[in-house]
Amino acid sequence: MTTLDHVIATHQSEWVSFSEEPLFPTPLEGGTEEHFPGLSSSSERSESSSGENHVVDEGSQDLSHSEQDDSSEKMGLISEAASPPGSPVQPTPDLASAISNWVQFEDDTPWSSTSPPHKETALTLTMPCWTCPSFDSLRRCPLTSESSWTTHSEDTSSPSVAPSYTDLQLINTEEQASGRASGTDSTDNSSSLQEDEEVEMEAISWWAGSPAMNGHPAAPPVTTARFPSWVTFEDNEVGCPSPPVPSPKKPNTPSAATAAPDVPFNSTGSFKRDRPKSTLMNLPKVQKLDISSLNRPPSVIEAPPWRATNPFLNETLQDVQPSPINPFSAFFEEQERRSQNSSVSSTTGKSQRDSLIVVYQDAISFDDSGKSQPHPDAIEKLKQLQIDDPDPVGNTALPDDDPTASVELDAPSPASALSQPRDGWPMMLRIPEKKNIMSSRHWGPIYIKLTASGYLQLYYEQGLEKPFREFKLEICHEVSEPRLQNYDENGRIHSLRIDRVTYKEKKKYQPKPAVAHAAEREQVIKLGTTNYDDFRSFIHAVQDRLMDLPVLSMDLSTVGLNYLEEEITVDVRDEFSGTVGKGDNQILQHHVLTRIHILSFLSGLAECRLGLNDILIKGNEIVSRQDIMPTTTTKWIKLHECRFHGCVDEDVFNSSRVILFNPLDACRFELMRFRTVFAEKTLPFTLRTAASINGAEVEVQSWLRMSPGFSSNRDPLTQVPCENVMVRYPVPSEWVKNFRRDSVLGEKSLKAKVNRGASFGSAGASGSEPVMRVTLGTAKYEHAFNSIVWRINRLPDKNSASGHPHCFFCHLELGSDREVPSRFANYVNVEFSMPTTSASKAAVRSVSVEDKPDVRKWVNYSAHYSYKVEIEQKKSLKPDFEGEDLENPKECGVQ
């Protein structure tokens, strides 16, 4: 008859066979095996000790009766030590049944104890067992748990006879309450338990069954000769250090008594997911802390609780009313909910509060002071607030955003005089019209008229009936940029050209292949004048006439033209003109005109749509995603006095506020123009000018500084500079000779530069040399403007701070006071340009081309400023307008 120990040994030997393919896969280190975390290490130890177990099995069959009685007595010690002190005497369990108790480790509910209550009559150890033949053989195998891991997967039907989880809690509770002298013995081993997530039963049982470690002679000690064999077992484990083992309280209690409670403890500790229930691990022995303090409310005497301070709460402002602009009504609902939850949790769950809950309740306790003194009226008012549009309709601060408000534009505008129709302009004609190597070119005086039908008529003199030349303006004509050109010994002349421009598509191969649309210009006429006002008036008249030209029938020769690169370019240019008051630089009058030019290269007939940030279509835009253009402003404006090119469908614009047009092919034309209100509160820079005339002594001084209120100047990283700045000081014709001097090549205008003053006239004529100085740029008299022109290429300067002031100073001593005119100029003229900016905040929000989604689209912005600044009349000049006396008030501080 086959005995139970023989069957177990046979199955164990098969399970630990040295085959290449193990029965169960060994999990790697850090693996995710849940039910067999320690299977790898235990199987390796069982393989190394399988031969020894067979010898023990054969010797156990010849066990004498005396040895069985001896073993029964010793097993009684084990079961007697397994029961806690003061508890009812537990019977001695059958060791074979205790072995089969390990099978319950694989159940789905490892923490539930399904074992029946212990019987009063204990069975004696009459059946020999291969795992524990005698305590003599235990010297080679200190505990049954060392080899019992080899049979835990063979039989799963035996009931559990080991101490239950409740018994273990009673043992640990008494161990926590009593001070143990042997707690320091397991300090090193317990420190390694905190670093490992898996608790190995074999390692715990080995240390618990070692009487030499705790010094208890009840069980036979492990000899030093057998200690290296256990080290080899530890080397085979996959990084599982030995955890701590609680030591018994009484010195006469054998150390093997801890093996019985440690067996189920280790089996439950091997589950990673159940680690929060770690009260069985006796951590307080290592950390010298009372673990029961976690279950008690925090005591003020032991350690004051940490209180989280609110960095946004100022206790001095507790009586301040809440801000009425807070639109979040949900904030108050959250506050009420928190107050209710905190009051309930403070009364019911105070005893169950751990350290984290204490910190959380302290962190939200700063709201209690504000809730104790509420403001019912203000809170009710805040609860009724709604989130409004950031640009509300009817806001007086933003007149353009109100479509119903009637904004009165400044009238008459400063630029109205330039756009007024005139009979003609005295101009200079460049003769001959084309360059010739054999002849020189010169300027000849003529008189020009512009007819309503778009004809330019050239007369030799004003009043003649028949022009000597006449030509018609065409849609392909463009007016060139104004420039200054040498004229005579007095100075330069303002010149412009009217060109016939054609655009052609060209391929470029350097530096990389690309397609470009180059412009070819053919000069039609070149004109010039020394009167700057006539010059600007003529330019405006020609631009108005080009825009009003009728659109002729489409040229069929260009309809079928296919472009390699289809593109459309939109140029938005703002022209600001106005008058600025003295002192605080307040804008007294202004006029903003926006011009939109189109240049397109589209194959065939194409219908285009252009959408602006018009306040009347706010919220009603319907455009495709690929047609949306990026903008840098969220402002909505109102358009005034709109004028359109002949290719625009005005009926569609009046109904939908969308510009629908058929663009001219390869021709730059003005699509539309409109007036708006200036979008800024201040100009890019402030200029204050003061003049003093005392007898024959004249002084003029200006201070220039960048304005911090201008939107572009707020961020130095995104600041847009002012380019080609001109500040013109009108000079009477009687004073011109004082600003010129003789040279080898004729008369020259004196020029003042940075850190270098300019001397005017001769000492014999005026008695002393006048001085003109600047701290930035250059200053000299220019005959084309009849003014002293202070020129600055760029503001702010690259080598100076943005808020650094710049100064112009001029001191002139006349021969007598009779040279002082009866009327002196009251304004200085300022003119400059700003790229990539907009004075009106007009923005192109969408550009769409019908049935052409792959068209390249470009939008360019620029602004041109031209305004007048009043001159302050003073008895004496001082660099500081606040009245501080300086040692030398006539000179500027050099930067």
UniProtKB/Swiss-Prot annotation:
Annotated SUPFAM superfamilies: Second domain of Mu2 adaptin subunit (ap50) of ap2 adaptor
Location of the SHD domain: 424-557
CDD domains membership: AP_stonin-2_MHD
GO CC aspect terms: clathrin-coated vesicle; cytosol; membrane; neuron projection; nucleolus; synaptic vesicle
Ranges of compositional bias, category Pro residues: 241-251
Skewed-composition ranges (Basic and acidic residues): 64-73
Residue span, MHD domain: 565-872
Entry-annotated residues carrying Phosphoserine: 278, 299, 759
Protein's cellular compartments: Cytoplasm; Membrane; Synapse, Synaptosome
Xref: PANTHER family: AP COMPLEX SUBUNIT MU
Chain's role: Adapter protein involved in endocytic machinery. Involved in the synaptic vesicle recycling. May facilitate clathrin-coated vesicle uncoating.
UniProt comment concerning the protein's domains: The Asn-Pro-Phe (NPF) motifs, which are found in proteins involved in the endocytic pathway, mediate the interaction with the EH domain of SYT1, SYT2, EPS15, EPS15R and ITSN1.
Name of the featured protein: Stonin-2
Organism: Mus musculus
UniProt gene name: Ston2
